[in-house]
Amino acid sequence: MIEKIWSGESPLWRLLLPLSWLYGLVSGAIRLCYKLKLKRAWRAPVPVVVVGNLTAGGNGKTPVVVWLVEQLQQRGIRVGVVSRGYGGKAESYPLLLSADTTTAQAGDEPVLIYQRTDAPVAVSPVRSDAVKAILAQHPDVQIIVTDDGLQHYRLARNVEIVVIDGVRRFGNGWWLPAGPMRERAGRLKSVDAVIVNGGVPRSGEIPMHLLPGQAVNLRTGTRCDVAQLEHVVAMAGIGHPPRFFATLKMCGVQPEKCVPLADHQSLNHADVSALVSAGQTLVMTEKDAVKCRAFAEENWWYLPVDAQLSGDEPAKLLTQLTLLASGN
């Protein structure tokens, strides 16, 4: 229902307009206060890069964060990552992730990023505290990438990158809750790069698509072509589950059942195992896998995806960030 409201297919969005005007008024006032320096943002001693979005829901932001961190690491840059840790609840903040940190403590995206990149990752509702925690334990870090947080103006930033779903884009264009917008589309004029996940990019936007890898068994780590798996049940607890189901079909998989779950939904063995019957194979997203690995069955697999950015702009962006991190 929410997708139909935000896309404009359902007329119910009109009933929510008063709340949207209130949301827009408050969010605009907050940004204006920081812009006029009525409120002070904390500036880190190293450059900060924000990877965020203008809309609620999945846009492919986390794969972009992983891509950015890995690309900078390949250039010899020491990167730290901070996040709010949405969906997790730590005993205290900031929380610096370790190999023992669970998604229940830190949230699923931070754990995924930590496992994929081996970069220092810290979470806190106050992102400046997370930055301080990383720099205290890893003083060699040269640049901070913040996963989401475009609207978290308490943390000053050097570079802003926005990720857009190229198919859904901005829906009906209204602020939450009548539409998907956290900020209006005009905000794009002030950011440094716009990355478009799928669809047809517009002038000045960087095209991106998600490239699926081999399926990975949660229990054994065995890899295989996902099309070799039989009697597949697909599960996705991400911001936009249909994207994952479409990716499977693109890989030649015709799931016997597709199970969309809420983003950041808590998972347990009983609920997940009930999704598959004898002889079926469960295939999930990598984001779900970080929550299920501790209690996985032998027939549970996940499909990792990597962000692939096209054109000349990604190289220019990476050069800019490398120089920034190097102090040039």
Curated annotation (Swiss-Prot):
InterPro entries: LpxK, P-loop_NTPase. GO terms for molecular function: ATP binding; tetraacyldisaccharide 4'-kinase activity. Keywords: ATP-binding, Kinase, Lipid A biosynthesis, Lipid biosynthesis, Lipid metabolism, Nucleotide-binding, Transferase. ATP binds at residues 55-62. GO terms for biological process: lipid A biosynthetic process; lipopolysaccharide core region biosynthetic process. Belongs to the LpxK family. Transfers the gamma-phosphate of ATP to the 4'-position of a tetraacyldisaccharide 1-phosphate intermediate (termed DS-1-P) to form tetraacyldisaccharide 1,4'-bis-phosphate (lipid IVA). This is Tetraacyldisaccharide 4'-kinase. It comes from Escherichia coli (strain K12 / DH10B). The lineage of its organism: Bacteria, Pseudomonadati, Pseudomonadota, Gammaproteobacteria, Enterobacterales.
